[in-house]
């Protein structure tokens, strides 16, 4: 499941739970692109649980949308990643180090308040 919806002002919530198929990936990424269109200094609040690799078709959809997704990087300056997977937390730290102007911080699933405080600061 991939669910993307507005949170408090300037924050977009992204929930990933289990496997994502091509249809869910296309709907979700199009929604994310639309929501970020006029955004500046945006914040992303990820909650990733029960992670399973997306289907091959879903990865194809993501690959086809890469030009639009790369345009989003300049519109977002912080991301909080709540996850129950240690490797996802580590990957988010590495991703944040590689993307200039984007600060990504991992959190445990029960650290909603700390994650939101990070995004607000």
Each model region followed by its residue ranges:
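Amphipathic, Lys/Arg-enriched alpha-helical "gate/interface" segment within cytosolic domains
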Residues: 1-121
